[in-house]
């Protein structure tokens, strides 16, 4: 595991390859989100914000996240997915589902226990038809360092909540993120 000091972590959060992309469309009380590139800490804040803004719509029945073009996922992204899945489960009429998940990405979810709280379909499943609405909104990838740190902290806390074994893996990450947030908040 890589050990970073608070200042290094902040630099890592701001200087990262920007080949990730999120698009979304809303049609017939369903939201279709497409991820291209890596599911990472960088893409997590806009995904979380977008879903949280939409999830309280009483007419919303489905949120689909198309993972067909997802090249991999980091722990922050998986923690955000777990948190969104748990949030969606508070509304019994709403289904939050990953579609077109590769076996490689499924294995990543299994490693951290996220598969236990997420509903998903693999790329190999026959009833996993591809639907991509014509008009899609490009989600803004902008978020400040504090927001990224907050989302990363909450995501890692969620990973520990769903599987206590994750505390061993992420204890120092959680502590580092908390220290960084305290510093950013002037504490």
Q: Can you name each region flagged by the protein language model?
A:
Residues 72:
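Residues immediately C-terminal
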Residues 75-80:
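Phosphopantetheine-attachment site and its flanking helix in carrier
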Residues 1-69, 86-187:
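STAS-like cytosolic regulatory interaction modules
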